[in-house]
Amino acid sequence: MEKYNREEFEEVIVDIGRVTKVVKGGRRFRFTALVVVGNRNGLVGFGYGKAKEVPDAMRKAIDDAFKNIIHVKLKGSTIPHDVEVKYNASRILLRPASEGTGVIAGGGARPIIELAGIKDILTKSLGSNNSANVVRATIKALSLLKS
């Protein structure tokens, strides 16, 4: 496992969830955080954290993200070829785009693509739009790229 300089990376919170457990004395809340980290130069990762407080969940998610960093192969400002990946009920289609197109992506895919340093890409999220599964599908798709 490589060590990364955390100052070089940006963090984006994709999702914060709250779960409630009803107990005799009232309600107990717990929080989950889904975070994406990237250096806008080919390195990107995601992490998932759970805790009783939001800041703790975010810290755990960021630590987890640095354990799951992948290197994305770029061809100029886009990706080398089309790729389609299924993760659970989510499917994501990534297509290279000509220069000047910009990032056409939504939901959980956009922060990953931007933090990976991709500037021109077309994406389509098919099936479930559950942000955790879309993030995982996007990371899986980017890891399958071959230069």
Swiss-Prot record:
GO terms for cellular component: small ribosomal subunit. GO terms for biological process: translation. Keywords: Ribonucleoprotein, Ribosomal protein, RNA-binding, rRNA-binding. InterPro entries: Ribosomal_Su5_D2-typ_SF, Ribosomal_uS5, Ribosomal_uS5_bac-type, Ribosomal_uS5_C, Ribosomal_uS5_N, Ribosomal_uS5_N_CS, Ribsml_uS5_D2-typ_fold_subgr. One of its GO terms (molecular function) is rRNA binding. Residues 9-72 form the S5 DRBM domain. The keyword rRNA-binding applies. It comes from the Bacteria. The N-terminal domain interacts with the head of the 30S subunit; the C-terminal domain interacts with the body and contacts protein S4. The interaction surface between S4 and S5 is involved in control of translational fidelity. Part of the 30S ribosomal subunit. Contacts proteins S4 and S8. Belongs to the universal ribosomal protein uS5 family. HAMAP family: Ribosomal_uS5_B. With S4 and S12 plays an important role in translational accuracy. Located at the back of the 30S subunit body where it stabilizes the conformation of the head with respect to the body. This is Small ribosomal subunit protein uS5. It comes from Campylobacter curvus (strain 525.92).
